[in-house]
Curated annotation (Swiss-Prot):
It is found in: Nucleus; Chromosome, Centromere. Acts as a central component of the centromere DNA-binding protein complex CBF3, which is essential for chromosome segregation and movement of centromeres along microtubules. CBF3 is required for the recruitment of other kinetochore complexes to CEN DNA. It plays a role in the attachment of chromosomes to the spindle and binds selectively to a highly conserved DNA sequence called CDEIII, found in centromers and in several promoters. The association of CBF3C with CBF3D and SGT1 is required for CBF3C activation and CBF3 assembly. Residues 206-251 are annotated as: Disordered. The gene is CTF13. This is Centromere DNA-binding protein complex CBF3 subunit C. Keywords: Centromere, Chromosome, DNA-binding, Nucleus. One of its GO terms (cellular component) is kinetochore. One of its GO terms (biological process) is kinetochore assembly.
Length: 478
């Protein structure tokens, strides 16, 4: 069997390399834990036992000298000593690998959408760009100078020219409160806020221990011992485990997280910021839906920042309209909303802004579709059974890419049974719910209440996508 030739691979067209990197999904080496999804799907998680072999001198040296440097990011994987040992072996050379660097170059050309963007982090007493895989494990890291030189291919670059680097993430979920403040302080000093295109919130603000963190004195902690760093990281990990509960109550409308507050106050300086990601229902209510903002003066996202945002991603919550209405109209330029791992979504309780374009719902347990059918029944003055008799089957052979044809039937209204004016009124009722929405995607949805009714214009232009939704039996096109 011929060996792999990296030089020939790098000579391939970028489209082919892009597909290869897409399927790698950010896993560049053999040292990676099980996907996080397994923890949610299985009641029993098999943990590796203690290593039965005797560690080599090299492994002992790596653990003694290298592990303390990365302990902040590795201690959550201490359940698997073999995994950490293997990771330390890769740590020396993986960041210099030609295929890894080429992957980041292609990812940069696609604006960080191929394998996700890099994140600002603080490692070995220096601000760095890091890439975390889907299991939140650190893969590689670079200084900003290395990233521009090796990835962006600008050897003689002007350090003040940041126009071509504006898609970096700032993810407080992968940072301790102390590191959040260190990163933000250095980003401000080096005038690097313009490189941030996305901010991710996910730490739990209900845990009181974080209140005691002194933001002003956090920089004095740079030379803290590895053991104290591990303890801080473990406390941070425990906080993240609580934030998925998504409890919203009158007694819990105070924003107390130092990490979140410090980040919010720096967001106006992030001129390239276009996307916000929020994990957890309470943070969503406070930061996105603005319930309880009067109880948090100076701790909410400003109007200037809201006008810059064109994409919001929400995940890990029971429902987004628990307080009555999910109002996104304050986000004037919001164009895309992604809802992931939400237990229940009522589309009738969501209000979109006037420039809204795209809605994606994936890994959702239950969706209540717009009450379009109910309004059409009133317009036609017929009951549900009579209305169903007006359905005719659509020729769905050309939509195999967008629908599960084994389970989903595409139907339309029989125009021969109703006059043209009535049909146009039915179309108007459909568009009254969709408004400016011109793309909708459903993926891994368990159940949908109300019949799914979509506009003919969106359906014919393939802007209605349904994947892996076995419970969706039919879609009505009007």
């Amino acid at each position: 069997m011929p060996s792999f030739n990296p030089v020939r691979f790098l000579e391939l067209p970028i489209d082919i390399r892009k597909e290869v990197y897409f399927h790698l999904d950010g896993n560049f080496c053999g040292a990676h834990p099980y996907p996080i999804d397994i923890l949610y799907k299985s009641n029993d998680v098999e943990l590796p036992g203690k290593p039965s072999y005797k560690r080599s001198k090299r492994s002992k040296k790596l653990l003694r000298y290298m592990y303390p440097v990365f302990a902040t990011y590795l201690n959550i994987f201490e359940y698997s000593p073999q995994l950490i040992e293997k990771w330390l072996e890769y740590a020396f050379w993986l960041r210099y690998d030609c295929l890894v660097l080429d992957c980041f170059k292609v990812n940069h050309l696609y604006d960080g959408t191929l394998i996700d963007a890099l994140e600002w982090t603080y490692l070995d007493n220096e601000l760095r760009l890091a890439y975390f895989n889907k299991a939140s494990m650190l893969e590689v890291w670079y200084t900003f100078k290395e990233y521009k030189k090796w990835v962006i291919d600008s050897v003689a670059f002007d350090e003040l020219d940041l126009l071509n680097v504006s898609n970096i993430q700032f993810n407080i979920d992968n940072l301790t409160p102390q590191l959040v403040d260190k990163c933000l302080s250095i980003l401000e000093q080096k005038d690097l806020f313009a490189t941030i295109g996305e901010v991710q919130f996910g730490q739990d603000e209900e845990v009181g221990e974080e209140k005691d963190v002194d933001v002003s004195g956090a920089n004095s902690d740079e030379n803290s011992s590895p053991s104290s760093t591990i303890k801080n990281k473990k406390r941070s990990a425990s906080k993240r485990s609580h934030s998925d509960n998504g409890n919203v109550g009158a007694t819990h409308n105070q924003l107390t997280s130092i990490s979140v507050i410090r980040t919010i106050r720096s967001m106006e300086s992030m001129k390239s910021l276009r996307k916000i990601t929020v994990r957890g229902e309470k943070l969503y209510e406070l930061l996105i839906n603005f319930h309880g903002f009067r109880d948090n003066p100076g701790k909410t996202i400003s109007y200037i920042v809201k006008r810059r945002i064109n994409e919001i991603r929400l995940s890990r919550m029971n429902q987004i309209s628990r307080t009555g209405l999910a109002d996104f109209t304050r986000w004037d330029n919001l164009q895309k909303l992604v809802l992931s791992r939400v237990a229940y979504i009522d589309l009738n309780s969501i209000v979109f802004p006037k420039n809204f374009k795209s809605l994606t719902m994936k890994r959702v347990s239950k969706i209540k579709w717009w009450n379009i059918e109910e309004n059409i029944l009133k317009e036609l003055k017929v009951d549900k059974r009579t209305f169903k008799s007006l359905y005719i089957k659509e020729d769905d052979s050309k939509f195999t890419k967008f629908f599960n044809l084994r389970h989903t039937r595409i139907k339309e209204l029989d125009k021969s049974e109703i006059n043209q004016i009535t049909y146009l009124r039915c179309q108007a009722i459909v568009w009254l719910s969709f408004r400016t929405l011109n793309h909708i995607k459903l993926q891994n949805v368990s159940e949908v209440f109300n019949n799914i009714i979509v506009p003919r214009a969106l359906f014919d232009s393939k802007r209605v996508e349904i994947y892996r939704c076995e419970k969706i039996s039919q879609v009505l096109v009007i």
